[in-house]
A protein has these predicted regions:
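Conserved loop-alpha-helix segment in the C-terminal half of the alpha/beta-hydrolase fold
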Residues: 262-304
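Alpha/beta-hydrolase
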Residues: 186-266, 270
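Flexible "cap/lid" loop of the alpha/beta hydrolase fold
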Residues: 159-199
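Active-site loop/oxyanion-hole signature of alpha/beta-hydrolase fold enzymes
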Residues: 95-136, 140
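Catalytic active-site module of serine/aspartate enzymes centered on a nucleophile-bearing elbow/loop
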Residues: 297-333
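Conserved HGGG/HGGXW glycine-rich cap/lid loop of the alpha/beta-hydrolase fold
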Residues: 47-103
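N-terminal cap/lid segment of alpha/beta-hydrolase-fold proteins
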Residues: 24-48
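Conserved hydrolase catalytic core segment
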Residues: 131-174
Length: 333
């Protein structure tokens, strides 16, 4: 009987935490299921960006930055299976020009510095601060998160740079030294010829890229790629992607081509997780080197993962992400 009473007491003790996580009392987004459109001021006018909150935790609030540039938030939806159980409050967010957000189709707005200011405006609107704000970005989102931290780290409690080197020149060097030599020479030559001829919007170009993508972007047969990943790609703002990144994931040739912040990483004192996959398009050794440059950092390599380790090494990726957040929250980092 005493054992039964103890079990019931423990169950009751856990219940308030669970119920509080789903408590929307006083939330102005309760009637929309957590969705909120945030007006963003830009040099070209004011536009709305889409966000959606999941959960309620005053101590831990995670803003998710998607990659691309130009992809939408759906990629992150796998976290629905993990974050609620860990009590993590998190926010989906489509950047301007992507997904459910406004797309003014003005290339002047596809600018890194402007996107940093956009993230800051989103932070202010969502009332995230140094006591609870974790910024998580993958690929281009990791680049954007790095740039944000360099300017606004006073607002951050934790930073996650996922599958993103802090130097595009170093990324391009890795692509030339390691990634391209491992490709089929005939296919690589045809890819490069199509790029030289300006024929990167053709089915043949996409067909030639798929073996590389299934090796280094998401290590699954294409027919098994999760639907939410495909949706994120299907809604890709291709014009933005090509302008900023270039036509493919084999290096970068767009307006971000000369971006390099490695030397500035030492100024970031925010606790940081640098995470990537063993088979990533991003050099795992370089990611480790970044952690030595940062003031307070941890490096995780997902041993079965690629650029999207959230899907091809999901348990390692999600457990590492949650462990980092909990360690920072509990003062163990």
């Amino acid at each position: 009987m005493k054992w039964l009473i103890l079990v019931l007491m423990l169950g009751c003790a856990h219940a308030p935490a669970t119920s509080s996580y789903f408590d929307n009392t006083g939330r102005d987004d309760a009637s929309t299921g957590g969705v909120r459109l945030i007006p963003i001021t830009t040099p070209k006018g004011t536009f709305n960006v889409w966000t959606k909150r999941v959960g309620n935790n005053p101590r831990i609030k995670v803003l998710l930055l998607m990659g691309g540039p130009g992809c939408s938030h759906e990629f992150w939806e796998a976290l629905d299976s993990y974050f609620p159980q860990a009590g993590v409050e998190y926010y989906y967010y489509d950047q301007l020009g992507a997904g459910f957000s406004d797309n003014p189709d003005q290339p002047e707005l596809w600018d890194l510095a402007r996107y940093v200011e956009e993230v800051e405006q989103v932070r202010q609107a969502l009332k995230l601060d140094h006591d609870n704000f974790y910024l998580v970005g993958i690929s281009w989102g990791g680049l954007l998160a790095t740039e944000y931290a360099l300017k606004y780290q006073q607002h951050l409690k934790g930073l996650v740079i996922s599958s993103m080197m802090s130097s595009i020149p170093a990324y391009n060097d890795y692509a030339k030294r390691v990634l391209e030599p491992a490709m089929d020479p005939a296919q690589l030559a045809e890819i490069q010829q199509l790029e030289a001829d300006g024929k990167t919007e053709t089915p043949r170009y996409e067909e030639l890229l798929m073996p590389f993508y299934m090796q280094h972007v998401l290590r699954m047969p294409f027919e098994k790629w999760p639907w939410n990943v495909l949706r994120s790609f299907l809604t890709l703002n291709r014009k933005m992607y090509v302008m900023m990144q270039g036509p493919s994931e084999i290096g970068a040739s767009g307006t971000l081509e000369k971006w390099d912040r490695f030397d500035q990483l030492k100024t970031i004192v925010t606790p940081t997780l640098v995470i990537g996959g063993k088979y990533d398009t991003m050099d795992p050794d370089y990611l480790e080197k970044m952690t030595h440059q940062l003031q307070k950092a941890r490096h995780v390599v997902c041993p079965h993962g690629s650029h999207m380790s959230l899907y091809d090494d999901q348990k390692i990726y999600t457990s590492s992400l949650i462990q980092f957040i909990e360690d920072v929250d509990q003062g163990r980092f």
